[in-house]
Amino acid sequence: MSEGDSVGDSVHGKPSVVYRFFSRLGQIYQSWLDKSTPYTAVRWVVTLGLSFVYMIRVYLLQGWYIVTYALGIYHLNLFIAFLSPKVDPSLMEDSDDGPSLPTKQNEEFRPFIRRLPEFKFWHAATKGILVAMICTFFEAFNVPVFWPILVMYFIMLFCITMKRQIKHMIKYRYIPFTHGKRRYKGKEDVGKTFAS
């Protein structure tokens, strides 16, 4: 490999100014993401605020309904991935390799591992809102459409998808909103001795 052939290198072998700028910008962005990780409620409040600003913008401009519909479907897709287990139980159940010994008890605690973790869900949802907001600044994305039909399509899609997801949750007995293994309290200490 000759000098200057690697990505971002200038003719003299040092990283170019543009590469260093975007590299530093990426580091700052990642640093902000890392700092925001423990503040779940604050992150979601900011995202809901952005969503509210976006909805007001669409309402005032009276357009960009296709962009809003696409954003709604994208958020629905993210939500379904958030509710789904990482390993589909129907795939684990269908393996017919012949008779096998039981390896688990039915009541054994298994933590719910999501297909899409909460932080990635929040990050993707927020980026989706920002991209949709940017699209509202360009007239090319303002496709004329009768918006009540889009609302009806979205409600139907939401109901059908959630019905299927809830049936899947009931069939394979998993709840995506558990907070760990159930803990039982023992009997209170009734045999206390009193000092006289």
From Swiss-Prot:
Stored Pfam families:
Rer1
One annotated GO molecular function is:
acetylcholine receptor binding
Keyword Nucleotidyltransferase belongs to the record: no
Q: Which UniProt keywords apply?
A: Acetylation, Golgi apparatus, Membrane, Phosphoprotein, Transmembrane, Transmembrane helix
For the modification N-acetylserine, the affected residues are S2
The family annotation for this protein states: Belongs to the RER1 family.
Name of the protein: Protein RER1
Organism (species)? Rattus norvegicus
In the UniProt record, the gene name given for this protein reads: Rer1
